[in-house]
Amino acid sequence: MSDLYRFGISLERKLIESFDRHIKAQGYQSRSEALRDLIREELLRKTTAEGGLVAGAIVMTYDHHKRDLVNRLIDIQHDFHDLIISTQHVHLDHENCLEVIAVKGNAPEIEKLSSALKVLVGVKHLDLSLSSAD
């Protein structure tokens, strides 16, 4: 027995034509694949807004020569240790580092961690990417 369900939807011609162009540009094999992704994205937005369980990555670049920055980064990560699964540290050059922090937990808490890191002087760029944890 299949877990897939079929259903029909009605859309205006302009909307479906625009959607078909999007599907082609993104390289989807079918409308169904594209719709599944859109539904997942919307459900993730809802989960995040409601403070649900999410997983993701915080990716940041920073200047490790900035005074006390490395110690502040470590302190903040320890303050949120229950959310952090792992970290990967990459030396980009003599001054710049890339850090990838894998996270899992309550969406608002992960956003607090991300914000606490982002505002530190010496952090050049930070991006938070979240996904469903289930």
From Swiss-Prot:
Keywords linked to the UniProt accession: DNA-binding, Metal-binding, Nickel, Transcription, Transcription regulation
GO biological process, one term: response to nickel cation
Coiled coil region boundaries: none
Entry GO MF terms: DNA binding; DNA-binding transcription factor activity; nickel cation binding
Pfam families, per database record: NikR_C (PF08753), RHH_1 (PF01402)
Domain of life: Bacteria
Residues where Ni(2+) binds: 78, 89, 91, 97
The UniProt record lists the keyword Transcription: yes
Cofactor(s) it depends on: Ni(2+)
Cofactor note: Binds 1 nickel ion per subunit.
SUPFAM superfamilies in alphabetical order: ACT-like, Ribbon-helix-helix
Family: Belongs to the transcriptional regulatory CopG/NikR family.
Function: Transcriptional regulator.
Protein name in the entry: Putative nickel-responsive regulator
Species this chain originates from: Chlorobaculum tepidum (strain ATCC 49652 / DSM 12025 / NBRC 103806 / TLS) (Chlorobium tepidum)
